[in-house]
Amino acid sequence: KRMLTVCGGPVCVYEAGESNCAPIVLLHGAMYDESRFIWDALFPALGERYHVFAIDTPRHGGSRPWEGELDRARLLEILTETFSLLGLDRFSIIGLSMGGGLAIEFASLHPEKIASLVLFEPGGLGEHVDLQLITWLYLKTPGMLRMLSRRYVKLQDPAIEKLLFTIFTKGTKPQNPARLTAILKDEIRGKFECGENDMDDWQIGAIAPFHLKWNLLEQVRSIACPTLWLRGEKSTLVKQSEMERAVALARENGAQAELKVIPNAGHILPLEQPEQANAEVLAFFDQTLS
Protein backbone atom coordinates (compact mmCIF):
# COMPACT_ATOMS: atom_id res chain seq x y z
CA LYS A 1 0.00 0.00 0.00
CA ARG A 2 1.32 3.42 -1.03
CA MET A 3 -0.05 6.87 -0.26
CA LEU A 4 0.58 9.59 -2.85
CA THR A 5 -0.27 13.28 -2.85
CA VAL A 6 -1.77 14.03 -6.26
CA CYS A 7 -3.18 17.39 -7.37
CA GLY A 8 -3.39 18.42 -3.73
CA GLY A 9 -5.20 15.35 -2.41
CA PRO A 10 -4.47 11.80 -1.16
CA VAL A 11 -4.43 8.82 -3.51
CA CYS A 12 -4.09 5.29 -2.14
CA VAL A 13 -2.43 2.67 -4.36
CA TYR A 14 -2.13 -1.06 -3.69
CA GLU A 15 0.84 -2.66 -5.46
CA ALA A 16 1.75 -6.30 -6.09
CA GLY A 17 4.02 -8.33 -8.36
CA GLU A 18 7.54 -7.88 -9.68
CA SER A 19 8.66 -4.56 -11.14
CA ASN A 20 10.12 -6.27 -14.22
CA CYS A 21 6.69 -7.65 -15.19
CA ALA A 22 4.16 -5.92 -17.46
CA PRO A 23 2.27 -3.21 -15.50
CA ILE A 24 -1.51 -3.36 -15.08
CA VAL A 25 -3.70 -0.72 -13.39
CA LEU A 26 -7.07 -1.59 -11.83
CA LEU A 27 -9.84 1.03 -11.51
CA HIS A 28 -12.91 0.18 -9.41
CA GLY A 29 -16.52 1.33 -9.69
CA ALA A 30 -18.60 4.10 -8.13
CA MET A 31 -20.59 4.63 -4.94
CA TYR A 32 -19.50 2.18 -2.20
CA ASP A 33 -16.81 0.41 -4.22
CA GLU A 34 -13.05 0.53 -3.59
CA SER A 35 -10.00 -1.43 -4.75
CA ARG A 36 -9.95 -3.90 -1.85
CA PHE A 37 -13.61 -4.75 -2.49
CA ILE A 38 -14.19 -5.44 -6.18
CA TRP A 39 -10.65 -6.71 -6.87
CA ASP A 40 -10.56 -9.05 -3.85
CA ALA A 41 -10.04 -12.12 -6.06
CA LEU A 42 -8.49 -10.64 -9.21
CA PHE A 43 -5.72 -8.52 -7.63
CA PRO A 44 -3.79 -11.44 -6.03
CA ALA A 45 -4.20 -13.60 -9.14
CA LEU A 46 -2.76 -10.87 -11.38
CA GLY A 47 0.04 -10.16 -8.91
CA GLU A 48 1.48 -13.63 -9.49
CA ARG A 49 2.27 -12.78 -13.14
CA TYR A 50 2.21 -8.99 -13.54
CA HIS A 51 3.14 -5.71 -11.81
CA VAL A 52 -0.26 -4.62 -10.53
CA PHE A 53 -1.48 -1.25 -9.24
CA ALA A 54 -5.01 -1.01 -7.79
CA ILE A 55 -5.89 2.67 -7.36
CA ASP A 56 -8.54 3.99 -5.00
CA THR A 57 -10.29 6.77 -6.93
CA PRO A 58 -10.70 10.00 -4.89
CA ARG A 59 -13.44 9.66 -2.24
CA HIS A 60 -13.05 5.87 -2.14
CA GLY A 61 -11.06 3.60 0.15
CA GLY A 62 -7.89 5.27 1.34
CA SER A 63 -8.16 8.22 -1.08
CA ARG A 64 -9.92 10.74 1.14
CA PRO A 65 -10.69 13.48 2.08
CA TRP A 66 -11.05 15.53 -1.12
CA GLU A 67 -12.45 19.02 -1.63
CA GLY A 68 -14.53 20.33 -4.54
CA GLU A 69 -16.27 18.67 -7.46
CA LEU A 70 -14.64 15.52 -8.84
CA ASP A 71 -16.10 15.51 -12.36
CA ARG A 72 -14.79 13.63 -15.42
CA ALA A 73 -12.11 16.17 -16.27
CA ARG A 74 -10.77 16.42 -12.72
CA LEU A 75 -10.70 12.65 -12.19
CA LEU A 76 -8.80 12.20 -15.45
CA GLU A 77 -6.33 14.90 -14.41
CA ILE A 78 -5.80 13.16 -11.05
CA LEU A 79 -5.40 9.72 -12.65
CA THR A 80 -2.98 11.04 -15.29
CA GLU A 81 -0.80 12.57 -12.58
CA THR A 82 -1.05 9.36 -10.51
CA PHE A 83 0.15 7.26 -13.45
CA SER A 84 3.06 9.66 -13.92
CA LEU A 85 4.06 9.50 -10.23
CA LEU A 86 3.99 5.69 -10.43
CA GLY A 87 6.37 5.83 -13.40
CA LEU A 88 3.90 4.18 -15.77
CA ASP A 89 4.81 4.96 -19.38
CA ARG A 90 3.00 2.11 -21.15
CA PHE A 91 0.58 -0.12 -19.30
CA SER A 92 -2.77 -1.89 -19.36
CA ILE A 93 -5.94 -0.94 -17.50
CA ILE A 94 -8.73 -3.04 -16.04
CA GLY A 95 -11.81 -0.98 -15.20
CA LEU A 96 -15.27 -1.77 -13.88
CA SER A 97 -18.29 0.51 -14.24
CA MET A 98 -17.04 4.06 -13.54
CA GLY A 99 -13.48 2.72 -13.64
CA GLY A 100 -14.17 1.28 -17.08
CA GLY A 101 -15.48 4.64 -18.28
CA LEU A 102 -12.37 6.38 -16.97
CA ALA A 103 -10.22 3.75 -18.70
CA ILE A 104 -11.98 4.34 -22.04
CA GLU A 105 -11.52 8.09 -21.78
CA PHE A 106 -7.85 7.86 -20.80
CA ALA A 107 -7.13 5.35 -23.59
CA SER A 108 -8.77 7.64 -26.16
CA LEU A 109 -6.63 10.59 -25.02
CA HIS A 110 -3.35 8.67 -24.64
CA PRO A 111 -3.39 5.70 -27.05
CA GLU A 112 0.41 5.52 -27.02
CA LYS A 113 0.37 4.72 -23.28
CA ILE A 114 -2.14 1.86 -23.26
CA ALA A 115 -1.11 -1.68 -24.21
CA SER A 116 -4.52 -3.30 -23.65
CA LEU A 117 -7.83 -2.82 -21.83
CA VAL A 118 -10.20 -5.05 -19.88
CA LEU A 119 -13.59 -3.41 -19.40
CA PHE A 120 -16.09 -4.93 -16.96
CA GLU A 121 -19.44 -3.33 -17.84
CA PRO A 122 -18.00 0.17 -18.31
CA GLY A 123 -20.10 3.22 -17.58
CA GLY A 124 -20.84 5.80 -20.24
CA LEU A 125 -22.14 3.56 -23.05
CA GLY A 126 -25.81 4.55 -23.15
CA GLU A 127 -28.03 7.56 -23.83
CA HIS A 128 -30.43 6.81 -20.97
CA VAL A 129 -30.65 5.00 -17.66
CA ASP A 130 -33.69 3.11 -16.42
CA LEU A 131 -36.09 5.37 -14.48
CA GLN A 132 -34.27 8.42 -15.86
CA LEU A 133 -36.67 11.12 -14.63
CA ILE A 134 -37.10 9.51 -11.21
CA THR A 135 -33.32 9.30 -10.84
CA TRP A 136 -32.93 12.98 -11.74
CA LEU A 137 -35.66 13.99 -9.27
CA TYR A 138 -33.96 11.88 -6.58
CA LEU A 139 -30.68 13.72 -7.17
CA LYS A 140 -32.40 17.10 -6.97
CA THR A 141 -34.25 16.37 -3.71
CA PRO A 142 -32.44 17.99 -0.76
CA GLY A 143 -30.71 15.47 1.50
CA MET A 144 -31.21 12.44 -0.73
CA LEU A 145 -27.60 12.22 -1.92
CA ARG A 146 -26.40 11.35 1.60
CA MET A 147 -29.40 9.34 2.70
CA LEU A 148 -27.77 5.93 2.28
CA SER A 149 -24.59 6.72 4.22
CA ARG A 150 -26.63 8.17 7.10
CA ARG A 151 -28.68 4.97 7.17
CA TYR A 152 -25.84 2.49 6.61
CA VAL A 153 -23.47 3.97 9.22
CA LYS A 154 -25.93 2.93 11.96
CA LEU A 155 -25.82 -0.74 10.90
CA GLN A 156 -24.08 -3.41 12.95
CA ASP A 157 -21.86 -6.03 11.29
CA PRO A 158 -24.62 -8.67 10.76
CA ALA A 159 -26.79 -6.09 8.98
CA ILE A 160 -23.86 -4.95 6.81
CA GLU A 161 -23.19 -8.59 5.88
CA LYS A 162 -26.86 -8.96 4.95
CA LEU A 163 -26.55 -5.81 2.81
CA LEU A 164 -23.47 -7.33 1.15
CA PHE A 165 -25.41 -10.44 0.12
CA THR A 166 -28.18 -8.34 -1.45
CA ILE A 167 -25.85 -6.86 -4.08
CA PHE A 168 -24.91 -10.32 -5.38
CA THR A 169 -26.88 -11.88 -8.23
CA LYS A 170 -29.30 -14.59 -7.09
CA GLY A 171 -27.49 -17.92 -7.00
CA THR A 172 -24.10 -16.34 -6.22
CA LYS A 173 -22.54 -15.34 -2.92
CA PRO A 174 -19.31 -13.75 -1.66
CA GLN A 175 -16.36 -16.10 -1.24
CA ASN A 176 -15.02 -14.09 1.71
CA PRO A 177 -18.09 -12.55 3.39
CA ALA A 178 -16.31 -11.55 6.61
CA ARG A 179 -13.52 -9.71 4.78
CA LEU A 180 -15.85 -8.03 2.28
CA THR A 181 -18.21 -7.01 5.10
CA ALA A 182 -15.30 -5.34 6.93
CA ILE A 183 -14.25 -3.50 3.75
CA LEU A 184 -17.83 -2.36 3.07
CA LYS A 185 -18.09 -1.17 6.68
CA ASP A 186 -14.89 0.88 6.23
CA GLU A 187 -16.27 2.44 3.04
CA ILE A 188 -19.60 3.32 4.65
CA ARG A 189 -17.82 4.99 7.58
CA GLY A 190 -15.42 6.83 5.26
CA LYS A 191 -18.28 8.26 3.20
CA PHE A 192 -20.18 9.32 6.31
CA GLU A 193 -17.26 10.84 8.22
CA CYS A 194 -16.04 12.84 5.19
CA GLY A 195 -19.56 14.09 4.39
CA GLU A 196 -19.49 12.60 0.87
CA ASN A 197 -22.44 11.92 -1.42
CA ASP A 198 -23.53 8.32 -1.96
CA MET A 199 -23.05 8.75 -5.71
CA ASP A 200 -19.90 10.03 -7.41
CA ASP A 201 -19.79 13.40 -9.18
CA TRP A 202 -18.83 11.39 -12.29
CA GLN A 203 -22.31 9.82 -12.16
CA ILE A 204 -24.26 12.85 -10.97
CA GLY A 205 -22.83 15.03 -13.75
CA ALA A 206 -24.30 12.75 -16.42
CA ILE A 207 -27.93 12.78 -15.28
CA ALA A 208 -30.48 15.07 -16.95
CA PRO A 209 -34.29 14.70 -16.73
CA PHE A 210 -34.80 12.78 -19.98
CA HIS A 211 -31.35 11.69 -21.19
CA LEU A 212 -27.71 11.44 -20.17
CA LYS A 213 -25.67 14.60 -20.74
CA TRP A 214 -22.75 12.66 -22.19
CA ASN A 215 -21.58 9.24 -23.24
CA LEU A 216 -18.24 7.79 -24.35
CA LEU A 217 -19.16 6.33 -27.74
CA GLU A 218 -16.85 8.68 -29.67
CA GLN A 219 -14.03 7.82 -27.27
CA VAL A 220 -14.69 4.10 -27.81
CA ARG A 221 -14.05 4.67 -31.53
CA SER A 222 -10.60 6.03 -30.62
CA ILE A 223 -9.44 2.93 -28.72
CA ALA A 224 -6.41 1.57 -30.56
CA CYS A 225 -5.36 -1.33 -28.32
CA PRO A 226 -6.73 -4.87 -27.89
CA THR A 227 -9.76 -4.75 -25.59
CA LEU A 228 -11.68 -7.44 -23.71
CA TRP A 229 -15.23 -6.45 -22.81
CA LEU A 230 -16.87 -8.48 -20.02
CA ARG A 231 -20.55 -8.49 -19.02
CA GLY A 232 -22.52 -10.42 -16.43
CA GLU A 233 -25.37 -12.21 -18.20
CA LYS A 234 -27.88 -11.17 -15.52
CA SER A 235 -26.71 -7.57 -15.17
CA THR A 236 -29.39 -4.90 -15.09
CA LEU A 237 -27.02 -1.90 -15.14
CA VAL A 238 -25.27 -2.21 -18.51
CA LYS A 239 -27.37 -3.65 -21.29
CA GLN A 240 -26.22 -6.33 -23.73
CA SER A 241 -27.15 -4.09 -26.68
CA GLU A 242 -24.99 -1.25 -25.30
CA MET A 243 -21.99 -3.55 -24.92
CA GLU A 244 -22.46 -5.02 -28.42
CA ARG A 245 -22.70 -1.54 -29.97
CA ALA A 246 -19.54 -0.42 -28.15
CA VAL A 247 -17.57 -3.47 -29.31
CA ALA A 248 -18.69 -2.85 -32.90
CA LEU A 249 -17.57 0.80 -32.64
CA ALA A 250 -14.21 -0.25 -31.19
CA ARG A 251 -13.65 -2.56 -34.16
CA GLU A 252 -14.42 0.13 -36.75
CA ASN A 253 -10.83 1.38 -36.87
CA GLY A 254 -9.32 -2.09 -36.85
CA ALA A 255 -8.76 -2.53 -33.11
CA GLN A 256 -9.08 -6.00 -31.62
CA ALA A 257 -12.21 -6.09 -29.43
CA GLU A 258 -13.98 -9.11 -27.97
CA LEU A 259 -17.12 -9.39 -25.84
CA LYS A 260 -17.44 -12.22 -23.32
CA VAL A 261 -20.65 -12.75 -21.36
CA ILE A 262 -20.26 -14.53 -18.02
CA PRO A 263 -23.25 -16.74 -17.08
CA ASN A 264 -24.94 -16.45 -13.67
CA ALA A 265 -23.33 -13.09 -12.92
CA GLY A 266 -24.40 -9.47 -12.67
CA HIS A 267 -22.63 -6.13 -12.48
CA ILE A 268 -20.05 -7.20 -9.88
CA LEU A 269 -19.00 -10.28 -11.84
CA PRO A 270 -15.36 -10.28 -10.61
CA LEU A 271 -16.82 -11.19 -7.20
CA GLU A 272 -19.82 -13.23 -8.35
CA GLN A 273 -17.86 -15.54 -10.68
CA PRO A 274 -14.23 -14.95 -9.65
CA GLU A 275 -12.75 -18.11 -11.13
CA GLN A 276 -14.21 -17.50 -14.59
CA ALA A 277 -13.53 -13.75 -14.51
CA ASN A 278 -9.91 -14.34 -13.46
CA ALA A 279 -9.45 -16.99 -16.15
CA GLU A 280 -10.79 -14.72 -18.92
CA VAL A 281 -8.60 -11.79 -17.82
CA LEU A 282 -5.43 -13.88 -17.42
CA ALA A 283 -5.93 -15.59 -20.78
CA PHE A 284 -6.42 -12.20 -22.47
CA PHE A 285 -3.27 -10.72 -20.95
CA ASP A 286 -1.25 -13.87 -21.67
CA GLN A 287 -2.22 -13.37 -25.32
CA THR A 288 -1.81 -9.59 -25.60
CA LEU A 289 1.14 -8.93 -23.26
CA SER A 290 3.33 -11.95 -24.05
Question: What function would you assign to each model-found segment?
Answer:
Residues 108, 117-150:
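Flexible "cap/lid" loop of the alpha/beta hydrolase fold
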Residues 1-10:
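N-terminal cap/lid segment of alpha/beta-hydrolase-fold proteins
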Residues 253-290:
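Catalytic active-site module of serine/aspartate enzymes centered on a nucleophile-bearing elbow/loop
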Residues 95, 99, 103:
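Gly/Ala-rich beta-loop-alpha elbow adjacent to hydrolase catalytic centers
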